Amino acid sequence: MPRGFLVKRTKRTGGLYRVRLAERVFPLLGPQGAPPFLEEAPSASLPGAERATPPTREEPGKGLTAEAAREQSGSPCRAAGVSPGTGGREGAEWRAGGREGPGPSPSPSPSPAKPAGAELRRAFLERCLSSPVSAESFPGGAAAVAAFSCSVAPAAAPTPGEQFLLPLRAPFPEPALQPDPAPLSAALQSLKRAAGGERRGKAPTDCASGPAAAGIKKPKAMRKLSFADEVTTSPVLGLKIKEEEPGAPSRGLGGSRTPLGEFICQLCKEQYADPFALAQHRCSRIVRVEYRCPECDKVFSCPANLASHRRWHKPRPAAANAATVSSADGKPPSSSSSSSRDSGAIASFLAEGKENSRIERTADQHPQARDSSGADQHPDSAPRQGLQVLTHPEPPLPQGPYTEGVLGRRVPVPGSTSGGRGSEIFVCPYCHKKFRRQAYLRKHLSTHEAGSARALAPGFGSERGAPLAFACPLCGAHFPTADIREKHRLWHAVREELLLPALAGAPPETSGPSGPSDGSAQQIFSCKHCPSTFFSSPGLTRHINKCHPSESRQVLLLQMPLRPGC
């Protein structure tokens, strides 16, 4: 634990003491010579008759006589200009008690009695200044009382020794000089100052002797919190708070009904009766900030997300230029406009990312070379290896699975406008499985042979200009591998009645690529390891995992008659 981590609180507050009036008046005398309490002096010195007699103003002459005697005898209060601090009778009694030692109280002094008004004023001041609160608040109160009593009722002159011991104080009427503070309070304050100085002096030495002497801790700079934009900044990403219009009145509940609770929107000042209504409230000052991509019209709520998204568009022009160069150096484009559109759809699918999958692509944008699968085919040969991009038909379009111009292009929806863009589906050219997104189709294409992907891409590696060696003997279609060709022959065997009218030029009788409209024929999934066929993709997957494990799989040419699946 670092040094100075636990600080012992040794500073104790001093006790509250009631300073005796005699100690304030005679600070130079020790405790042996301390006079008795002044409050007890009048009651102890006065005789019983004087204590019992109520103070009256019937003796004005005696007061004048005392003043005259005071002037004749030479009072030390006026001659020396000092205040003895007590009345004459109290001083005389104290002197008598100090000389004779402890014993019975001496006889009352023959000095005349004090006037009644002076006695009342002295008792009132003593009563007001005898409490500790008054003594602490007015440290010079006792001296003022003593000076006041001396000026009102002087007594006999003190001895020269006592006069020397008395402190030199200004008379009461002079307000310029202030009396000295109490000695006990001054001693306590000096002790506190000394302790504080020692503590401050030890602090740098402790810091220097510690292990972290090189880096003295600096006070942390407090972060200045700025609440200037508190009403214009929303904590939710993508939202912004509009500034309040100066003339817009605050809306509230209809009628004069008072809401049950204080559920008020802090922005538009609308009041609600319950917190649920306030939670469902859509404030008019909160607006959504949209950051739209200029290339694909995607909307983001943060500019950083938009900048990260736009990086996906950067490689696209390079891929398009490479495809254009490959089309210029490779085979010449076909004279048929339909074949150029088909190859353009395939190339755009491979070149563009998934962010732009739903954008309308024009037919003349980035013209590409024709698909290599149809390079050596006749115009009436089918099928063409490409990507089929369809819109959802309502009702479904009657078309065959291998007809000319269906695969690899978008078929418009009947009755829809040319500028309108509907939902699209993407059909696998091998198993005719439909997908709603390009990413799903890309993942599905990886399950087929690697040669099928090379057949889709006209500019893929060294096979860019090489002809496809595996041709179908029935329709003349060329395929990159024998497995895909045998799968194609399997489709010929299963749907021969559907393919023959399409190849002869007759209109197809099916309602879609999956089979006839009556539902008698379904899509068939064949195993590439054995002649088994299935009507669903999960069934084929289960068959492959069960019957053809990875260590014993062998590619078999499908030249045997079909048999039902296991």
UniProtKB/Swiss-Prot annotation:
Task: Give a brief account of the tissues where this protein occurs.
Answer: Expressed in heart, liver, skeletal muscle, kidney and pancreas, and, to a lesser extent, in brain, lung and spleen. In the pancreas, expressed in islet cells, including insulin- and glucagon-producing alpha- and beta-cells, but not in acinar cells (at protein level). Detected in adrenal glands, particularly in the deeper layer of the cortex (at protein level).
Provide the Gene Ontology terms for cellular component: cytoplasm; nucleus; transcription repressor complex
Q: What would you give as a GO molecular function for this chain, any one?
A: zinc ion binding
Coarse class of the primary localization is cytoplasm
Protein's UniProt name: Insulinoma-associated protein 2
Q: Does the keyword Ubl conjugation apply?
A: no
Function of the protein: May function as a growth suppressor or tumor suppressor in liver cells and in certain neurons.
* PANTHER family assigned: INSULINOMA-ASSOCIATED 1, INSULINOMA-ASSOCIATED PROTEIN 2
UniProt cross-references to SMART domains, sorted A to Z: ZnF_C2H2
Q: Where is this region: SNAG domain?
A: 1-20
The gene for this chain is INSM2
Q: Which GO terms describe its biological process?
A: negative regulation of transcription by RNA polymerase II; neuron differentiation; regulation of cell cycle process
Chain intervals annotated as zinc finger (C2H2-type) = 263-283, 291-313, 426-448, 470-492, 525-548
Localization, per the record, is: Cytoplasm; Nucleus
Q: Which organism is it from?
A: Homo sapiens
Q: Which Pfam families match?
A: zf-C2H2
Q: Where is this region: Disordered?
A: 32-117, 310-418
Q: Where is the composition biased (Low complexity)?
A: 318-348
